[in-house]
């Protein structure tokens, strides 16, 4: 068997990321399977696709912040007590989401948000509110699954997480096929994708839940020891989580905002419904070649030397920051190549839309230009994911909050300005999303530079203090550990670069 010594340090990264990348792609395939379940209903298929797309994108706004609790499990959960606190936070948040879904479905608030703001007709609005009610419990189920997935990732069980997500998609596809042959197609076709979505999430939650109890629960202590800073408090978890939640909320609310402006730009006409349907169909297809890059966020925390579950150092295989940077660049190059192969080569994207989602050729033609714009998304997504992972390791996520604000500002500005330049429909929506991504990644880069310079200043000042008092043993050694860790991080990074040169 051939061995490649130069790749030795990259195999752990590949083994960790590949299941997560497959997970991300599998989620997109699941969305396409759900869209096919709607498209297979020949009567009012476009209207149904638009209604489900509006409801699903609004629901994702609530699911997004809670699913990002995966990163809390990845960084903070070191004991059973930590896990209990994380689950409690998710139960409370899920209950709030259920209440809000119910209010949207049954009160004038829902009529204003869906019918009035989106300028959709009464039929589409009614179907959207009904779908939103059916999706009320999904955010809680999804968040519970992702919380346990984060704990599994902390212990390098990314393969188990990947298997759970693939099983989720398989369950969705199977149930779409089963329900299409049931009486639901005639009675309530909207339930076909929604019930399939629930069954897939239930399968995923069952697998990660059983996996947690099988491989982790008995191997972690009741409470965290002082070597990891003691038990994480709910306040610390929420302080770490809220900037990530805000970012993901703005990412998820971007789709409803795009749907809103695109629909209003076309005055709620038949063309508006068609444009929203095109966006619903192109989101999962366009996201598939680059969406997995988001999982690069988990690489830094998982391979952090301070992670108590990290056994790579003991096994002799050390993954340094330089290895992670090179691996990230390779992933970016691979994603860009995939995007241009799929979206710019003749007939490939149309075949995906026709054969997998089940739309007709005329509808697929409308999706070509929006899909080609997706080819440029990998660059800002990679920059954002790589730097966010580094900041998560330092537990300095608070500096990321402004990036979400800038993303929304750039997104809305583009949605307002581009129509005056002759850009309309789904092309307007995807082009504005790209502008928002670029604005967000720029702000994340600025935040990372700010933190890095601050760390450098700390390193320089503490080196001076160490020289002055190197013969003394400070009484507050434990208390100053967090600060010294940051300095060691920077010092080791410099040493790694010198060693490899």
From Swiss-Prot:
Q: Which Pfam families match?
A: ANKH
Q: Name one GO biological process term.
A: phosphate ion transmembrane transport
Q: How does the protein's chain sit in the membrane according to the entry?
A: Multi-pass membrane protein
Q: Does the keyword Transport apply?
A: yes
Localisation: Membrane
User: Which residues does the entry place in the Cytoplasmic compartment?
Assistant: 1-85, 153-158, 211-327, 384-403, 453-501
Q: Which GO terms describe its molecular function?
A: inorganic diphosphate transmembrane transporter activity; phosphate transmembrane transporter activity
| UniProt region (Disordered), positions on chain | 457-501
> Which residues span the membrane?
86-106, 132-152, 159-179, 190-210, 328-348, 363-383, 404-426, 430-452
Where composition is biased (Basic and acidic residues), the residues are 478-490
**Acidic residues: bias regions:** 462-471, 491-501
Role of this protein: Regulates intra- and extracellular levels of inorganic pyrophosphate (PPi), probably functioning as PPi transporter.
The entry sums up its family as follows: Belongs to the ANKH family.
Output this protein's name.
Progressive ankylosis protein homolog B
